[in-house]
Regions:
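Low-complexity, acidic/polar, glycine-enriched regions of mature
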Residues: 17-187
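Sec-dependent N-terminal signal peptides
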Residues: 4-13
Length: 187
């Protein structure tokens, strides 16, 4: 009788644990966290980093379920141009109203609305991305490792910048082909 009772209690205990939410919020380390960006143009590309201002993920039983990241657009950098003068010229151009209009919109935001686990550490993520005050839904695959109060996330996001009103030298406005900057930006 006691063995049967123990087994029943064990099943109830396991079932109870499995259905009880265990939601945890883990803050991003803004000193180590950044967004890598890459934009392509005819004959080449530019790339760089942008720092996070703040951010966190939400997990339930160690699985990603949500999150929010504030991106500090004032910290945008360039990596590919070696001349400091020309690198800074590009950064200033990216900050002006042709691109991210950083004076008006100093931050961008990514809010994870849904994260579906597709393999051990990979998730299909649906999120709202706000750039220049315009919000659009995006989908991407991300590799997320959660260990206690630490996490590491990597993923490739490709967006059509024109959906966020970044149309400088875009193909949709009839730019001459040799001056064209691709509409897609990679993060």
């Amino acid at each position: 009788m006691s063995k049967k009772l123990f087994f029943v209690l064990l099943i109830v205990s396991i079932t109870s644990y499995a259905t009880k939410p265990h939601v945890t919020s883990v803050k991003a380390d803004t000193e180590k966290s950044y967004v890598y960006w890459r934009g392509n143009e005819v004959g080449g590309f530019h790339d760089g980093n942008i720092k996070l201002k703040s951010g966190y993920i939400i997990s339930d039983h160690g699985k990603l379920v949500g999150g929010k990241f504030i991106i500090d657009m004032n910290t945008i950098t360039n990596l590919d141009i070696k001349s400091e003068k020309y690198s800074q010229k590009l950064v200033n151009h990216l900050k002006d109203d042709h691109f991210f209009d950083v004076d008006k919109f100093p931050t961008s935001m990514l809010i994870i609305k849904n994260a579906k686990k597709i393999s051990d550490q990979n998730y299909n993520i649906t999120a709202d991305l706000t750039v220049r005050g315009i919000t659009n839904e995006i989908n991407f695959i991300s590799n997320v490792r959660i260990r206690g109060n630490q996490f590491q996330a990597e993923g490739d996001i490709v967006i059509d910048r024109t959906k966020w009103d970044v149309k400088y030298r875009s193909s949709i406005i009839g730019t001459v082909a040799d001056k064209l900057i691709e509409d897609n930006i990679e993060f």
